[in-house]
Amino acid sequence: MTRKQRYEWMLDYFRKKMPEVQTELEFGSEFQLLVAVMLSAQCTDKRINQVTPELFRRFPDARSMAQVEADEVLEYIKSVSYPNAKADHLVKMARIVVERFGGEIPHDMDQLLTLPGVGRKTANVVQSVAFGKATLAVDTHVYRVSHRLGLVSEKDNTPYKVEMALTKYIPEEDIPRAHHWLLLHGRYVCTSRRPHCEKCGLNDVCPSAARQGISH
């Protein structure tokens, strides 16, 4: 099977299984999405969704968060990973959004990357989910699933290389959904330590499943 055929199989499977798919993070605005994504680094969406309702009631927008110190934000996010660093980044981000962008989250990738605590993965999520752009964020789930399914080569050994490889084969109209497809597949089926290959609808074409002697 060629790599192109593998992509076609994968895309056909997910289009049928998850035609409508979206982030599991809960938010009410572009600012709140950015905050939630920043908080989600090395933390589960479930945990973030437990924290953000109170956080967003207190800080619904960039202007309200920009007016306080990190210690006040910290009180709302103590249960997430690296709370001190994230609180610091959130306040600095909010202040820059207010000062440079009039309180609105910028659409431009380069401008997003100037915000404290915002890397390429976070910027891609915001561009895709908030602004509908054809960007594909590569987190640990997307990275793992892409390699296990043989969608990328061993040489694609960084998130950026995986992103470039995936977007080369995935049609532009499917790129926003593809991030969620691969992420959710990695979160619930192709898990890190004990992947559920026996119930995976892609095991017929998965090199990793084949090595374990598993297929339909």
Name the predicted role of every residue range.
Residues 2-216:
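Catalytic cores of DNA base-excision repair glycosylases
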